[in-house]
Amino acid sequence: MSARLTETAAKVKWGIIGSGGIARRRTIPEGFVPARNARLVAVWDASAPTNKEVANEFRAAAADSLEALLAADIDAVYVASPVQAHHDQVLACARAGKHLLCEKPLGRTVAEAEGMVEACKRAGVQFGTAFMMRFQTQHQAAAKLIQEGRLGKPVYGRAQLSCWYPPIANAWRQDPALGGGGSLIDMGSHCIDLLEMFFGPVKSVSCFTNRTVHAYPSEDSAVVLLRFANGALGTVDTFFCIPDDSSKNALELYGSHGSILASDTIGQGSQGVMTAYLPADEAGYQAQQGRATGSGFKIAPEPRNTYLAEIEAFSAALLEQKPNPLSSDIGLHSQKVMAACYESARTGRAIEL
C-alpha cells in the first residue's frame, strides 16, 4: 500500500519483525494491545514456534516469511529483531512502502544506520527509533523544569543502567559482530539519549570499556565522560555484571540552582522515585558547607506506560501527518555518539562529535 495513510484511517495497522524478546515481553502487551490508535495485524519471527505462540497469544496473523508479512494489509512495521538483521529488514520494509519503528541501536555501525535512514527517505516512509524512555512522565516533567530554567545553568548529569547478564549461548548482545557492542550500545544509548534530552547535544566523549566479570566478546562494563555543547559535563555508566537488585539505575541532574535526583526511572518500568531540590533563591557561600534537609519535593506525575506512549505517539504522527516524535535523526545521532565512544575506548583519546 501507499506510505500515505488515508484520511479516514482510525488506527495504524502494524506488523512486527522479531515477535519474541522485547516485543513479546513488553511492546505488544503494554503498547500495541491497549493502544487506541494502533492495531497489531501480523507478526513474523525467525523462530517459527515462537512466532506461532505470539500470534496465538495476541490474536495476530503468523506470517511464515518476511515477504509474507510485507504482503499483509499493514501500514507500519515495528522492528524488534536482533541488531545484525536490522539493516536488511528495514531496507525491505522501506521498499514495500511501510513506515518503520526500529529498536535501538539502529544498526551495528554508522554506515548501516545511514543506509537505513537514506532508504526510508527515498521511499518516503517515516522511520523512528524506539527510545521509549523519553516518554517516561517523570523524565518529561524533569525536562520541563530544566527548560523553564528551574535548575539554573546545567552543570552535570549522570545516568546509570545496569543488570546481571551472564553468558548465554547465541546471545547477540554478547557478541559485537552481532549487536555492535555490549552494555554500552545496548543500555548506554538510552542513557546518553536521556541526558541529551535534558541538557542538549553532546560535543565530545571519553570512554572506558572492559570485560570485568564475563568472558564473552562484548564489554560488560562501560563508563563515558560527556561534554555537552552548553558546557555541562556528564557521565554514563552501564554494566552487564552488577546484580539487578544492587543497582538503582540512578539519574542525577545538577544545575546552578539545584538538582533533580532519581532512582529506577531509567529502565523498562514506567515509574521510579524522583526528587527535586530547587531552592527558591540563589544560595550564598557557606563556609561550613551545610546540607539542608527536607527541602526537596517529589516529582510524581501520573505514570503512563512508556511502550504505550511510544506506540500511540508514533501512530498519531502517521495518522495526523505530524512530525515524527522519534525521528530517525535521533537514532542516527545516537549511532554516531556510540561509535565515538568505542573509538575513544580503543584509542584512549577524547573524541569530538
Segments from the language model and where they lie:
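N-terminal Rossmann-like dinucleotide-binding module
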Residues: M1-E57
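C-terminal glycine/acidic-rich active-site capping loop/insertion
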Residues: K11, M132, F228, L251-D329, ...
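Hydrophobic residues in well-ordered beta-strands that form the structural core
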Residues: R24, D64, V79, L101-C102, ...
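C-terminal helix-rich "cap/oligomerization" subdomain common to oxidoreductases
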Residues: M1-K11, I16, A76-V79, A313-L353
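Predominantly a Rossmann-like dinucleotide-binding segment in NAD(P)-dependent oxidoreductases
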Residues: M133-Y216, V223, G348
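Basic phosphate/pyrophosphate-binding loop/patch that engages nucleotide-derived ligands
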Residues: E118-Q126, Q140-V155, Y254-G258
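Beta-loop-alpha module in the N-terminal Rossmann-like domain of NAD(P)-dependent dehydrogenases
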Residues: S47, F58-A119, T306
